[in-house]
Amino acid sequence: AWYYGIYSAGSAMVAAQDGSFQDDHTGTANAWDRQFPATGRVIFPFSLRVSSLVEASYKKEMEKLKAGQTFDLMTKPTNYTDAHGACVAYLSGSAAWWKWKTESAIVGSREFKALNVTNFRTKAARELRDSRLVGKSLSFLHQAFRYRGKANYREALFLGYGDYVESSLSNYLDDLTIVLRGFLAMSGAFACKRLGLSIWNLISNERQPPESSAGAAASRLRRRAGAARSRS
C-alpha cells in the first residue's frame, strides 16, 4: 500500500505536467525523474538523485552528496545530519542494485552474446555496458520500487529472527506513513499549482470513505490529474 501511494502520487505529477501515463513502473519512475528531480522541482529529500549508473560517475556524485559524512543504515538517525546520511546511503545502495540489474539484462542481450564473452573485462564489453548505463539516472521513485521488492520478498523473512530485528523495526509503519504523507503533500501541491485551484478543488473535495488511506488518495489524484490534463 505504501509503494502504490508513492507510485500513484508520482504518476499524478507526471500526468498533471504533460498528460501522459507510462506503461510500467520503471517508465513512470524515469518520467518522474526527468521532469522533476532532474530539473530541481522537488523538495529534499525526494530531490536526491544520480544522473548515471556508470560506477565511476555515480560514485563521484555520491561523494558530493555525502559531503564527508558516512552513515550505517542499521543505526537509527537521531538528527538531520544522520537522516541526510541515511538517505544518501540508501541512494548509493540503490544505484549499485540498479547497475547490477541493468548489467544482468545486458548479459542476456544479443549484442553481448555476439561479443563471445562471459563478463565485462574486455574493452568492447565495457563499452557496451557503459553505453547502456550512462543514460540511466536514478531517484526517489526508483528507490521506492526497489524498497517495495525488498519489503515484499526479502525483509519479511527476517521479522521472526529475534529481538534485534524487532527493535530495529520500532516505529517502522509510522515512519513509512510520514514519508508517504510528505510525498503526497508535495505531489498535491504541484498538481494544484499546475492544474489550477478550481480543478484541484474538484479533486480534493471528491467524496471518499472515512477510512480512505493516503495511498487511496494518491490513486485518486493520479486518475483525476490525468483526466484534467487531457481536457486542458
How does the language model describe each region?
Residues 1-232:
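Terminal alpha-helical segments
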